[in-house]
Curated annotation (Swiss-Prot):
It comes from the Bacteria. The lineage of its organism: Bacteria, Bacillati, Actinomycetota, Actinomycetes, Micrococcales. It is found in: Cytoplasm. Keywords: Cytoplasm, Methyltransferase, rRNA processing, S-adenosyl-L-methionine, Transferase. GO terms for cellular component: cytoplasm. It comes from Pseudarthrobacter chlorophenolicus (strain ATCC 700700 / DSM 12829 / CIP 107037 / JCM 12360 / KCTC 9906 / NCIMB 13794 / A6) (Arthrobacter chlorophenolicus). This is Ribosomal RNA small subunit methyltransferase H.
Amino acid sequence: MNEQPKPTSERHVPVLRDRCINLLAPGFDAARQQGKAPIVIDATLGMGGHSEAMLQRFPDLHLIGIDRDEEALALAGERLAPFSARTDLVHAVYDEIPEVLADLGVTEISGILMDLGVSSLQLDERERGFAYSFDAPLDMRMDTSRGQTAADVVNTYNEEELVRIIRKWGEEKFAGRIANRIVAARGEKPFTTTGELVEQIRSVVPAGAAKSGGHPAKRTFQALRIEVNEELDVLERAVPAAVDALAMGGRIVVMSYHSLEDKIVKSVLQGRSKSSAPLGFPVELEEHKPELKILTKGTEVPTAVEIAENPRAASARLRAAERIRARRAA
């Protein structure tokens, strides 16, 4: 008899799990040296794989898990139940870190992990509409309790707006053709499923483009997902907020999955790792000194073994930094 497929939470292999933990660990040590119990934020909790590994390894660690996806939060809660005395799980978007910490009475943290993009749970749950590989309602919301859906976007945005988001968020060179086709098709019948959208995209993207760019709908789906969830706007607010929350010696680790995400992460971390002294200033005052020390040379990527275990990790790019000076005054 064939075994039934394991639930997504059991199949899930956390991306770069050991490397993430090893990068965060010195931040926990720094807290202990200051006589404090270490506190870490998993800002994109997902199914809790990274968090579970950290809680198992560090018995004194307190975890704050944040996720906008209520289903993921519930599954992670079950997974992390043995550690419930050392966890706070919060339904929020990760740019709300300052509010979450204020509500919990936490003033600073020892580390923060961000694993960006769409989760395995969201990709595997057909009805969520994130995947172009099977037909499903055209939704794509990470938080299904609020906000516009992907169907709302493709059925209501004008052609110029569609071109803009598909080109900007999807980096799709056929954005004009795709937007034009979407507008024409919805005039006959509004889009309701992913399959309908994939069919229209296939009709205008040259077959040869798939050889180098993957599935013809890949970039458009990425663009719609980013638009629906305001992912890059959230990220631009979240990374600075995360850095501001770090205690001395605390560390931030971020995994991104496409160049738009990585560009934002790189900009913030590198910007905060440089002197802010005005050009030509004769001395570097304390408040001008770098706040962060970069811990990774460029980006780190998964090994071939890790990719074999989890093919979705192939595009992961990791950056990390450590706080070496108190936050800048506003």
